[in-house]
Curated annotation (Swiss-Prot):
Protein name: Small ribosomal subunit protein uS4
Keywords recorded for this protein, A-Z: Ribonucleoprotein, Ribosomal protein, RNA-binding, rRNA-binding
Family under the similarity heading: Belongs to the universal ribosomal protein uS4 family.
Family annotation (Pfam families): Ribosomal_S4, S4
Lineage: Archaea, Thermoproteota, Thermoprotei, Sulfolobales, Sulfolobaceae
Range of residues in the leader sequence: none
GO cellular component term, pick one: small ribosomal subunit
One GO MF term attached to the UniProt entry: rRNA binding
UniProt feature coiled coil, ranges: none
Quaternary structure, from the entry: Part of the 30S ribosomal subunit. Contacts protein S5. The interaction surface between S4 and S5 is involved in control of translational fidelity.
UniProt function note: One of the primary rRNA binding proteins, it binds directly to 16S rRNA where it nucleates assembly of the body of the 30S subunit. With S5 and S12 plays an important role in translational accuracy.
Originating organism: Saccharolobus solfataricus (strain ATCC 35092 / DSM 1617 / JCM 11322 / P2)
């Protein structure tokens, strides 16, 4: 059966490491989503690849079983927030990209909700324990937020940011910086 303590890689590296277009695209994603390294992109690609593989395998099933399994997979992806409408089909699953998954990361949602000024500050607030989901501290910026948890994201109860959230301020040199309110 295997040792339960043995951890496995959750990603697959690109087949060819030096493709200029892919490197440029990955650099753009690193900046847009405030990722630490390309491994986080590869993990997102692997998760999406798994869902797309499941959707392709549905096409080979008999119609009765296919309808049941398709409904289960669409329901799971709706709950995760990767699909937007209940009438989603296998084609919608096959059109998912890693950007769809990166949009559901806690780091991205904290930034988009306005709890931080930058995507990088969102990562720092999460890793330092200032962010809670449903009242529970979450310290992983890569946490995938479900749709029902999205409105429950706030500062942690004992966080100093709860009473004084960060605000943008114009400093003397004309630079914009973070200042405690």
């Amino acid at each position: 059966m295997g040792d339960p303590k043995k951890s496995r890689k959750k990603w697959e590296t690109p087949g060819h490491p030096w493709i200029k277009e892919r490197i440029g695209y990955e650099q753009e994603l690193l900046g847009k989503y405030g990722l630490r390294n390309k491994r986080e992109i590869w993990i997102a690609q692997s998760i999406i690849r798994k869902f797309r593989h499941q959707a392709r395998s549905l096409l080979a099933l008999p119609p009765a079983e296919r309808a049941v399994r398709e409904k289960q997979l669409v329901g799971k992806l709706l709950k995760m927030g990767l699909l937007k409408k209940e009438t989603a089909t296998v084609d919608d699953i096959l059109s998912l990209t890693e950007q769809d998954l990166l949009e559901r990361r806690l780091q991205t949602i904290v930034y988009k909700k306005g709890l931080s000024n930058t995507i990088y500050q969102a990562r720092q607030l999460i890793t330092h324990g200032h962010i809670a989901v449903n009242g529970k501290r979450v310290t992983s910026p890569g946490y995938i937020v479900n749709v029902d948890e999205e409105n429950l994201i706030d500062y942690y109860v004992t966080s100093s940011f709860k009473s004084r959230p960060p605000v943008m301020s114009q400093q003397e040199g004309g630079e914009i910086g973070v200042k405690q309110a």
